Amino acid sequence: EIIDKMKLFYEVIVPYDYLKDILLKHGVKCKALNYWTSSLIRSKPKVIHKTRDPSKLVFLYNGTNDIRKNVTTLTRIFANVLENTEHILIVKTNKPDNLTITKNIRVITERISDEQLASLFNLCDYCVTCTRGEGVGLLHLEGHYFNKPIISHEQGVFKQLGVDIIPLPYNEVDI
């Protein structure tokens, strides 16, 4: 339904090419400003192919730790899922508040360079987020740039835009 509403406009302005490419596939006339986009991608870092080791997977979350992003839930889930494995979740965020930290969860709160961030994306096997409050966020944009599968919630705009994600399981509860 969002796509149909966008088709009513002469042209839709979107923040970056990644979203423009998705919308064009759905017949929406649009252009990208590429003004507010990832400084990481603007720096055009090298993408290094990595062969996944199924016994030692590396998951990456890159974003702020705030209520809307649901990072506390993400680390709590991964603490249980990764227990007794060699898999690792790397959380690159602004603050460690209320995050579950185990031997399988590494939290980075320091500012890092785009080169260091590119290394994290090249190192990981999957990008992961638990947020339901993003349109198509920077993690999706950056993960796509580095050819990483994205594990994400499929509610809202993700599903309607046809963003290529591995959906998180969920149950809807009547309130």
Which residues does each predicted region cover?
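A short, active-site helix/loop in glycosyltransferases that binds the activated sugar's phosphate group
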Residues: 10-30
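Short beta-strand->alpha-helix junction loop in the catalytic core
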Residues: 33-44
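Conserved catalytic-core segment of nucleotide-activated headgroup transferases in glycan assembly
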Residues: 46-116, 122-123
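A short hydrophobic beta-strand element within the catalytic core of glycosyltransferases
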Residues: 127-128
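Aromatic "clamp/platform" in nucleotide-sugar-dependent glycosyltransferases that forms part
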Residues: 132
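Short glycine/serine-rich donor-binding loops of glycosyltransferases
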Residues: 137-140
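Short hydrophobic beta-strand element within catalytic cores of glycosyltransferases
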Residues: 149-152
